[in-house]
Structures are given as C-alpha cells and as structure tokens.
Amino acid sequence: MSLFQVYARALQYLAVHKFRVGAIVIANIVLAAITIAEPILFGRIIDAISSQKDVAPMLLLWAGFGVFNTIAFVLVSREADRLAHGRRASLLTEAFGRIVSMPLSWHSQRGTSNALHTLLRACETLFGLWLEFMRQHLATAVALMLLIPTAFAMDVRLSLILVVLGAAYVMISKVVMSRTKEGQAAVEGHYHTVFSHVSDSISNVSVVHSYNRIEAETRELKKFTQRLLSAQYPVLDWWALASGLNRIASTISMMAILVIGTVLVQRGELGVGEVIAFIGFANLLIGRLDQMKAFATQIFEARAKLEDFFQLEDSVQDREEPADAGELKGVVGEVEFRDISFDFANSAQGVRNVSFKAKAGQTIAIVGPTGAGKTTLVNLLQRVHEPKHGQILIDGVDIATVTRKSLRRSIATVFQDAGLMNRSIGENIRLGREDASLDEVMAAAEAAAASDFIEDRLNGYDTVVGERGNRLSGGERQRVAIARAILKNAPILVLDEATSALDVETEARVKDAIDALRKDRTTFIIAHRLSTVREADLVIFMDQGRVVEMGGFHELSQSNGRFAALLRASGILTDEDVRKSLTAA
Ligand SMILES: Nc1ncnc2c1ncn2[C@@H]1O[C@H](COP(=O)(O)OP(=O)(O)OP(=O)(O)O)[C@@H](O)[C@H]1O
C-alpha cells in the first residue's frame, strides 16, 4: 500500500462526527489567520514607534489577538481531546468484536498476543495522530498555506527565500522517508517479537519460576530488544541528519532575509517594519515546518503499524457470516458427520474422512491416543474450525448454512481446560445463561457437586477465580465448568475430558449430574478414563485424525481390536472377558 492509500483508509476510521470536526477546522483557520497577522502587526508597531506615532490601539489589538488565541486554543483542544478519545474507545470496541469472533484456527495462526498488540498499537496510533492533527497540525497546515501568499503580497524577493526554505524541508523529509522505509517496517516486526516474548513469559510466569527461567527469559528479551534497537538506530540517525540539514537551511534563509532585507531598506524599496515582519514569517515558517516534519515522521512511523492493522482487519472481514445464513432452531439432536476432512494451516495435522451418524439422545464416546484429533472433531461440530471437505448435519441441516450463534446456542461444552474467565464464580456459571437467577445458578452448582466448595469460600458465588481460574484447583474449575453447561441446558452436550481432574468420589457425584444431563440429549464424551464411556451408544476410536474403529461399547469391547486392547490395558476388561466374549460370538 502506498502512503496515500494507507492514510486514505485511516481517514475512513476517523470520518465520523463531521459537524464537530468541521467546527474544529473553522476554528483552526481563524487561529492560523491570527498567527499570520501577528508578525505584520508587530512590524507595524515597530514602524509606528520609529515614526513616533500612537501605538496604543495596535498594542490593544495585539493583546486582543492573544486573549482570543488562548480561548480558542483551549476550546479546540478540549473538543479535539473528546473526539479523539471517543474514537479510540469505539475503534477498540469495534475491532475487538470482529477479532474475538474469528475461528480458533485464525487465532492460533495469527497469535493472540500478536493480534492484541496490533490492535492496541493501531488504536493508539490513530488516536495520537488524530488528536495532534486536530489540536495542532491542522492550524499549522492552514498557517503555512496562508503565510506564503501573504508574504508574496508584501515582497516577492524575500518570499522566494521562504519558498526555497519550505522546498528544502520537504525534499529532505522525502529523501529520509524513502531511505528508512524498509528499516521502519523491520522495527515494527521487532516490536511484535518483543511484545510476544513479554506476553508469553508473563502469562506463563509459573513455568518461568519453576524452571528457573527468570534470567534466561530476561536474557532472551534483551536479545530481542537489541535487535529492535539495531534496526531502530539507523532510522533515528537519518532523522537526526534531517534535523541538522533543516537547521542549516533555516540559518541560511534567515541570513539571506537579513542581508537582502538590509539592502532593500538601504535602497528605500522596503520599510524596516516589513523586514521585521519577514523575519517573523521566517521564524514562524521554521517553527511550523519543524512541527510538520515531526508530524511527517509520526505519519511515516505509523504507516507500518496501520498496514499491519489493515491486514488484520482484512483477514477478519473475510470470515464474516454470509448474509443468507439461517437460524438453527428447535434442535432434536441427530448429528451426522459426512466425510469430514480438515487440516490445520501450515500443519500436517487435522482429521480425515470422518463419517458417522448419531441418533438424537445418544451418547457418543470419542476415544483414542493423545493427539488423535478428538477435540478437533468436536470443535468442527461447533464450527470453531471450518472443514475443508464434507458436511456436518444437525437434524438434517448442514451447519455451514446456519449462523454460528444459533449453532452454538444448541451446544453446551465443558472444555478440557475448563475455560474459566477472570470473573466471579457466579458470573462464570452464568455464562451458560445470562438471565439465570441466583437460585438457578445455585441449583446448577449443586448438580455439578460444586456448591460445597463455593459456599466454603469467604465470598461464595462472588469469589473471583483469577486468570483462567488459577485461584481454584483443577477439580474445582471443572465443576464450575460443568455447572455452566448444566445451566445452559442445550440439546447437544460436549464433554471434553470434563472430569479428568476429579477424584474418584467427586467424579462419582458429578457423574450422577452428567447422567441426568445426558438424558434426552445427544452427548459427546471425550475421555481417556475409559470407565466414563461405558454407557456410550456409539464409540468412535480415532488415531492420527482417522476413525479406526466404530461401534457400540459392547460390540467394540468384545472384538479383538484397538478399543478392546485399550480397555484391557486400563484394567477395565480382562483377557478372560475377551476370551469369553469371543467364544460366545
Ligand atoms: N491450532 C493447531 N494448529 C496446528 N496443529 C494443531 C492445532 N491444534 C491441534 N493441533 C494438532 O492436531 C492434532 C489433534 O489435536 P486434538 O487436540 O484434536 O487431539 P486430541 O485427540 O483431542 O488430543 P488429547 O487427547 O491430547 O487432548 C494434534 O497432533 C495437535 O498437535
């Protein structure tokens, strides 16, 4: 994207509140006109003093300019602050909504902290540029536009010096921008690496402590920051050189105005006051050009951040729901996978040609070695991932044709890692159903055998659980997650290793709740503890993304296949059981 395209697109994010922005623009034009009038007035005062005229009215006018300038500046700043802060808040909310709705595969590909970093930096950048533009640079730009014609009206010869000075500034900035374009993009890349490292280490602080990684992680960060600085120094050097060259250009122009102005005064072609006004113009021009250069540097530095953000936005927009997506309603719970295949991006992992059909109300156990694709399969059912091939039908409706929202309303999931948010226990359970009463929340907790430990806590249901529920034990987290699914009361239930962290006694209590919940619901159970899948109507044994065995629990346990071998290995089935069943067959 060219610089122009980047900022044309950036403006689309800012083109709101047109009336308020218009008022700021008008105020800035007035402010700029006063800024130009001041050196002229100053020159007139000097002339009046030297010819011993009355300067009081001009001094009064000058004071009036000062008061008006101050009041207008405060009002413009206040309005600009409000506009820019408001825009930052809305941009963050809008972009957050889109990003958070992206499939998990997108997040794992993009990197959650990377996306977060891009989003926050883009919000800050757009906000900062917008604020400075409205507060300061708009007036600067208008002042520069008014200054040159005013100067030309006074004296063409001295004005040409100002034009050459302006052109020198622009040329120097252009050269520096083209020389540092790649360097600046590299700086952005290094910023991402630094941020990802910091966020990865801090979010895994227990591992960092337990494995004595504090120094090592700090060393690693130092390495990344060094790389960042190595990329950043040459860019900064170029801009420092530009400042030096600008200073030389300003000094030369100032001297030229003085020398030529003196000659013109001596020849009687120009008054002293006019030369003084021109020196004021030159000073104004230098100050404003410096401000514009600083703004141009910011615009240039922000370019890579904004491009990164636009890429993020584009990848998000591509995945929005089609307008004609239907609503999945009145689900009974028949689930069919028809030749489903899915690959993770940049990975050989996924699932291949999975087909099965489960009747409404049945329990389906998905078993198999770790990494076999069990979680991926249930994620596909919820359209966390989109299959590359095949169809998934619920009650005969292809789930690709309905909104994700309606699909997910029909499914309650207990995640492998419980998935608790840093909120109170009550709020975590209520994620199942927002409008549930406290009594309903408590009943769900009771059914999930969670009420005892919750009520033992000082703040009961108001106890805040910490990030990812880290202030609860693994078993407590799972019971809160089960209570949440119970409260949701959806026709399809997914239990992904839902009871793996529970002791035998608690698991037995929770099992009663789950058994009650399973009734009249299609339930998918993923479990390594095979005792929990005994009641399954259908067992799907997966390995390396494929279904290798499928059938009823008794049918598979009596065959001499991998499921039976696994049952024997876990002591659920003895060799004697198998021999008996084979003989009977
Ligand atoms: N986002 C991802 N990108 C690339 N590969 C992935 C991703 N998520 C999972 N995988 C890989 O896909 C395979 C299946 O993962 P999945 O989580 O479905 O296994 P699973 O059978 O549920 O394992 P477990 O019993 O250990 O939970 C694994 O090899 C895993 O490494």
Swiss-Prot record:
Keywords: ATP-binding, Cell inner membrane, Cell membrane, Membrane, Nucleotide-binding, Sugar transport, Translocase, Transmembrane, Transmembrane helix, Transport. Residues 21-301 form the ABC transmembrane type-1 domain. GO terms for molecular function: ABC-type beta-glucan transporter activity; ABC-type oligopeptide transporter activity; ATP binding; ATP hydrolysis activity. Its EC number is 7.5.2.3. Pfam families: ABC_membrane, ABC_tran. Its main location: membrane. It catalyses: [(1->2)-beta-D-glucosyl](n)(in) + ATP + H2O = [(1->2)-beta-D-glucosyl](n)(out) + ADP + phosphate + H(+). It is found in: Cell inner membrane. The chain crosses the membrane at residues 22-42, 55-75, 136-156, 158-178, 245-265, 269-289. One of its GO terms (cellular component) is plasma membrane. ATP binds at residues 368-375. Signal peptide: none annotated. Residues 335-569 form the ABC transporter domain. It is an enzyme of class 7 (translocase). SUPFAM superfamilies: ABC transporter transmembrane region, P-loop containing nucleoside triphosphate hydrolases. InterPro entries: AAA+_ATPase, ABC1_TM_dom, ABC1_TM_sf, ABC_transporter-like_ATP-bd, ABC_transporter-like_CS, NdvA, P-loop_NTPase, Type_1_exporter. It is a multi-pass membrane protein. Involved in beta-(1-->2)glucan export which is required for nodulation of legume roots. May be involved in other classes of oligosaccharides export. Transmembrane domains (TMD) form a pore in the inner membrane and the ATP-binding domain (NBD) is responsible for energy generation. In NdvA the ATP-binding domain (NBD) and the transmembrane domain (TMD) are fused. Belongs to the ABC transporter superfamily. Beta-(1-->2)glucan exporter (TC 3.A.1.108.1) family. Homodimer. This is Beta-(1-->2)glucan export ATP-binding/permease protein NdvA.
